[in-house]
Every structure is written in C-alpha cells, then in structure tokens.
C-alpha cells in the first residue's frame, strides 16, 4: 500500500485556495488590464497545484488513489468506504467478546503441519470480556488490561490482531489504545483470548473500514488462531479442518448454562499429546447434536454432548466430579469444553441454573450462570 501523501482535508483546502486565487487573478487581470501572458501563467500555475493535490490525494486507510478531486466526490473512499475526513471517524468503540462452549469435539488424525483435524460444534454464551478501542495520537499503540496480564503486550493476541488488521488493510495515520476488561477465565477452553482478538478486529472495522465484510475479517482471523474466525460472527457453527472451516448452524434453542472453572488447568498441547498416545478412544461425532439443532430440540442436543478430551483427563482431575454435580443439580447434561478445564451444564430454566450455580460457587468461586447467545 502507498502511504497518503496529502490527506483529504489538506487536499480540499489546496483545491479551494487554488480556485479562489485563479478567480482573484482573473479579476485583477481584467481590472488592471494586465497581459494575457500573466493571466495564462496564473491559471496554469493554479491548475497545476490543483491537479497535484488531486493526483496525490490518497485514502488514509487503504492508501489507494482517490482518482477524483475532493470537491467532486463524497467524504468516503470509493475503494474501502473509510471516512476521509478526521471528524467523520469515530474516536472509540466498545465490543463484547463472548465466550464459547464446545457441544461436541472430535479430534481426528494429526496433519503434516502439526495441527489435528477436528470436528466440533461451538456455540456462543453470555459470559463475556469487554474490549474498548480508542484512537490516539501516539507515539505508539497501547494495551491496558484489567486485571493486568503477565505476558508482554506485544505477545498478546489483541495486539497481534491489531498488526494483522493494518498489515492487510493498509497504513494507519494514528495509533490505537486497546482496553481489555477480563471476565472469561483463562486456560478454560472457553476461547477468551480468541474472542478478544476477534473483538479487536470487529472494533477496528468500525473505526477505520465500516464496509469491510465478515468474510474479510474471517480471513484475517485465520492468521491469529483456529478459534478466532468463529468469534467474528458468533452464534452456533460446525468447525472442521483445524477449526477454521465454519458452517453456520441453526441457533440453539433458548437455554441457560452453568459454567464452572476449577483451579486445575490443562495445557492444550499436553491434552492433544495424551490423545495421540491413547491406545483407543471412542471418537465422538456431531450427528446427534446437529439433528437436535435442526429440530430445536434441547433434550436431543444435551443427549448428544461429547468431547474426546474427557477421555484423557489427568489422574485426580475434578472434572468428572463437577460433571456429575451439575447433573445431580438438574442439568440436562454436562461436559468439559475444549481441552478444559471449564465444565458447563445445560438448563432449560434460568431459576434452576441459578440454584445450581449458587451451590457450586461455594466450592468453585469461578462459577457463572449465563444464557446462550
């Protein structure tokens, strides 16, 4: 992308001044009876400045030449749709970054690139982080987290999303502050980091390129992680490949979830390695859940829950205990999400879910009662 040499507002000022000067010089020439040579040179000089301003006027976001002089077009780039005037760009935007749960998760063979083939049905839930983006004058991009994160800001997936967006979209003329308010537990299999990154991409679209499509954002999201493309649209989807190939599914019927995050954590790489070492595993599939979604049958969906990672839990894991506790407290069914360690239970009624959550919260402080979204 070529960087803008003259911004829209400057080009417009130059063009207006050029026109005014040409009119003034034309009038003076007539009044003072100056030579035609003077008039001609004045007009040529003014037109030269005018044309240069038009030719070198580029979109501040995508860097493409705007082709037409600014007085003869609207205030939006014809290529990317970004506002061309500073005061038309929003200064900040707030996005919800919702968590997900895996209704099914089947891990297949390991691919040559090191990833595993997977088949999973994911659905968004009402537990969310809040991501706010602010445009600032710099001198650099910033990440502010509450609570603070231990990793370097540059390694955070939100900052990587920022770099991917502008690497694909084009140069930016200012800097961005990302404020991240965390609620989703980490190392839980709830996709919190991936959802935050997707929220950054959506927010940058609002700030800089309002006509960018979800498909374009999903292509960027693929560079950030297997789960990130899902969070661009959310809802309910079947993911295959390494998780990036998405097929939209019918919405989940209305229901409530109790999500429990115990203190234990399961490194994703270690869980995949455990599956690779397993002599035999049942290998679940998504057929029952897909059929239940088609009929909007919550009981059928609950009956079809499965997750291959539950077969290779470390010894002494609290996951089976939590799963059984949720069932005893009225959940239609319960299981671990992702590679863990969060567990969720499905409930028809909010009241039943709230009672179960209040009981489990005594032993597991990170317990949440949320709707499906």
Give the positions of each predicted feature:
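Conserved, helical-rich catalytic subdomain that frames metal- and/or nucleotide-binding sites
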Residues: 233, 238-333, 348-354, 358-361, ...
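Cys/His-rich microdomains that often coordinate metals
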Residues: 66, 84
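Contiguous, small/hydrophobic- and glycine-enriched helical/loop subdomains that border
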Residues: 174, 197, 201-238
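ATP-binding N-lobe of GHMP and related small-molecule kinases
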Residues: 90-188, 206-215, 252, 261-264
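Short linker/helix segments within small regulatory modules
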Residues: 67-76
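Glycine/serine-rich anion-binding loops at beta->alpha junctions
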Residues: 179-208, 226, 331-347
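Long, charged N-terminal interaction/targeting segments
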Residues: 1-54
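Short cysteine-rich clusters marking metal-coordination/redox-active sites
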Residues: 59-62, 77-80
């Amino acid at each position: 992308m070529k960087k803008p040499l003259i911004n829209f507002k400057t080009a417009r000022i130059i063009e207006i001044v050029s026109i005014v000067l040409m009119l003034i010089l034309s009038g003076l020439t007539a009044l003072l009876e100056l030579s035609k040579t003077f008039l001609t040179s004045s007009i040529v000089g003014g037109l030269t400045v005018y044309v240069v301003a038009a030719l070198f006027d580029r979109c501040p976001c995508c860097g493409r030449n705007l082709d037409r002089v600014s007085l003869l077009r609207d205030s939006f780039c014809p290529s990317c749709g970004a506002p061309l005037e500073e005061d038309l760009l929003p200064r900040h935007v707030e996005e919800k970054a919702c968590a997900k749960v895996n209704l099914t998760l089947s891990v297949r063979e390991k691919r040559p690139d090191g990833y595993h083939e997977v088949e999973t049905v994911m659905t968004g839930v009402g537990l969310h982080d809040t991501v706010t983006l602010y445009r600032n004058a710099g001198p650099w991009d910033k990440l502010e987290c509450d609570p603070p994160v231990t990793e370097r800001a540059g390694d955070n997936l939100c900052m990587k999303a920022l770099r991917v967006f502008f690497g694909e979209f084009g140069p930016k003329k200012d800097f961005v502050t990302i404020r991240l308010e965390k609620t989703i537990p980490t190392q839980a299999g709830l996709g919190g980091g991936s959802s935050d990154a997707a929220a950054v991409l959506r927010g940058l679209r609002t700030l800089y390129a309002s006509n960018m499509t979800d498909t374009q954002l999903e292509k960027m999201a693929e560079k950030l992680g297997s789960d990130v493309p899902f969070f661009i649209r959310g809802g309910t989807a079947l993911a295959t490949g390494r998780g990036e190939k998405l097929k939209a599914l019918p919405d989940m019927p209305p229901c409530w979830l109790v999500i429990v995050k115990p203190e234990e954590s399961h490194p994703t790489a270690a869980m995949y390695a455990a599956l690779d070492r397993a002599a035999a595993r049942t290998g679940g599939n998504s057929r029952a859940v897909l059929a239940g979604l088609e009929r909007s049958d919550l009981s059928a969906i609950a009956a079809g829950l499965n997750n291959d990672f539950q077969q290779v839990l470390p010894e002494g894991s609290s996951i089976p205990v939590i799963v059984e506790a949720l069932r005893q407290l009225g959940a239609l069914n319960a299981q671990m999400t992702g590679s863990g360690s969060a567990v969720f239970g499905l409930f028809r009624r909010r009241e039943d879910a709230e009672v179960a959550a209040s009981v489990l919260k005594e032993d597991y402080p990170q317990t949440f009662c949320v709707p499906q979204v």
